[in-house]
């Protein structure tokens, strides 16, 4: 009878109350139980008050209660009905797995994005290369055009130089013609063939055999302008004797030395082309004119320029490998 009453009384008590009563009967404190079970005192207190901590999984809570029951000598079978109420097993929340098709779509989208990125990169590189090639081709065409123009100008200058030489020879012959009548009237012993010879060479031979009196007449009869025309074999008078002084060096002189073949065009302030054409390696130019000078240089790296005794900086044209267009002012300040 007493056993049944005790059993009914134990069933009326909760799991926490039974564990607390058993601990008190053994004379153990909550601190001692916590140390033996390696738990916190707050966890032991929650178990005795039938509280389930929110941050503690039900599986761990059931294990703690069973360990506590073995410590205070309570059979686990008597606590199972209470455990089902106090710490029911809760299904673990498992995150739903993403569909394989979703991952496949994302991978496909990333592939399209990468393809578009590479396509844009290739287009940018292609446009940059096309722009560089067009600029390089335009420079080469410009250099070729300038070289052709300079060749045409040189050919025109050579074709025009022939009439100029003919007129100069004619002027020299006309300048020597008035001396023939004087020679004829001065001496009656001279032969007719000698009086009609027009060439300066025959005149010089006649002057070699004319008597001194006739030579004086020739000298007096020769006009002043004819005296300035000298035959090819005559030696020029010294500058001191002629009263002519050597001119001073031009401060605006432009000196250029070439280390490689280079096309060049130089124009002064009056628009006169001082030079236009191709200069070969190891060549040099010394030009004078009215400043400022305008220069076009096909290969800036192949020429060294000195203006007013100072070198001209062409490094910015050499770095970009472009045709140099610059103006040299009187203050020796090259401008683009």
From Swiss-Prot:
Keywords, sorted A to Z: Cell inner membrane, Cell membrane, Cell shape, DNA-binding, Membrane, Signal-anchor, Transmembrane, Transmembrane helix
NCBIfam families recorded: PRK10856.1 (NF008109)
Gene Ontology, cellular component aspect: plasma membrane
UniProt protein name: Cytoskeleton protein RodZ
GO annotation, biological process: regulation of cell shape
Residues in compartment: Cytoplasmic: 1-111
Biased amino acid composition, Low complexity: 165-201, 219-236
Transmembrane helix keyword on record: yes
Subcellular location: Cell inner membrane
Function text: Cytoskeletal protein that is involved in cell-shape control through regulation of the length of the long axis.
Signal peptide residue numbers: none
Residue stretches making up the HTH cro/C1-type domain: 19-71
Transmembrane annotation, as ranges: 112-132
Disordered as annotated region, ranges: 148-248
């Amino acid at each position: 009878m007493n056993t049944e009453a005790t059993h009914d009384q134990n069933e009326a008590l909760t799991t926490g109350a039974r564990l607390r009563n058993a601990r008190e009967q053994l004379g153990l404190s909550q601190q001692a139980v916590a140390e033996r079970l390696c738990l916190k005192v707050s966890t032991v207190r929650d178990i005795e008050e039938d509280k389930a901590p929110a941050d503690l999984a039900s599986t761990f809570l059931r294990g703690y209660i069973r360990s506590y029951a073995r410590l205070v000598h309570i059979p686990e079978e008597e606590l199972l009905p209470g455990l089902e109420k106090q710490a029911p097993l809760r299904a673990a929340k498992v995150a739903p797995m993403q569909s394989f098709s979703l991952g496949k779509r994302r991978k496909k989208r990333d592939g399209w994005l990468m393809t578009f990125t590479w396509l844009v990169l290739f287009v940018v590189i292609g446009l940059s290369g096309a722009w560089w090639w067009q600029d390089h081709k335009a420079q080469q065409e410009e250099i070729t055009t300038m070289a052709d123009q300079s060749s045409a100008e040189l050919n025109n200058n050579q074709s025009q130089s022939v009439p100029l030489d003919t007129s100069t020879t004619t002027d020299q012959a006309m300048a020597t013609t008035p001396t023939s009548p004087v020679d004829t009237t001065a001496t009656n012993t001279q032969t007719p063939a000698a009086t009609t010879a027009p060439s300066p060479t025959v005149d010089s031979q006649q002057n070699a055999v004319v008597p001194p009196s006739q030579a004086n007449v020739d000298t007096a009869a020769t006009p002043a302008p004819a005296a300035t025309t000298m035959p090819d074999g005559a030696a020029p008078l010294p500058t001191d004797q002629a009263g002519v002084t050597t001119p001073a060096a031009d401060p605006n002189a432009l000196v250029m030395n070439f280390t490689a073949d280079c096309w060049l065009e130089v124009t002064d302030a009056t628009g006169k082309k001082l030079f236009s054409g191709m200069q070969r390696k190891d060549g040099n130019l010394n030009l004078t004119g009215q400043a400022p000078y305008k220069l076009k240089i096909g290969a800036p790296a192949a020429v060294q320029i000195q203006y007013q005794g100072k070198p001209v900086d062409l490094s910015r044209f050499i770095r970009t490998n472009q045709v140099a267009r610059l103006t040299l002012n009187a203050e020796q300040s090259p401008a683009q």
